[in-house]
Amino acid sequence: MSTSQSSEQTLNYQWDVCLSNMVVQSGIGLGAGIVSSVLFFRRAAWPVWGGLGFGLGKSYADSNARLRTFHAIPKQLPASSTQKKD
């Protein structure tokens, strides 16, 4: 039996995905900036900020595309512990 999800639950799920992508991708960009700064640029600060900027920009673009497309929303959201399981 399929239960329908409210639009509020769907939007909350999409925002959760976008925020987790932002944390992960900005962390990856920051890490890549730190590594490149230490190895190649004699500990300059600009590669760190550039990597962080690339990570945040990538996550913004992904979130923008995810929130604007209708078919990107999954039909069945993962069940949370507060929902009744049948």
UniProtKB/Swiss-Prot annotation:
InterPro entries: Mic10. The keyword Membrane applies. The keyword Zinc does not apply. It holds the Pfam family DUF543. The chain crosses the membrane at residues 22-41. Residues 42-86 are mitochondrial intermembrane. It is a single-pass membrane protein. Keywords: Membrane, Mitochondrion, Mitochondrion inner membrane, Transmembrane, Transmembrane helix. One of its GO terms (biological process) is cristae formation. GO terms for cellular component: MICOS complex; mitochondrial crista junction; mitochondrion. It is found in: Mitochondrion inner membrane. Its main location: mitochondrion. Belongs to the MICOS complex subunit Mic10 family. Component of the mitochondrial contact site and cristae organizing system (MICOS) complex. Component of the MICOS complex, a large protein complex of the mitochondrial inner membrane that plays crucial roles in the maintenance of crista junctions, inner membrane architecture, and formation of contact sites to the outer membrane. This is MICOS complex subunit mic10. It comes from Schizosaccharomyces pombe (strain 972 / ATCC 24843). The gene is mic10.
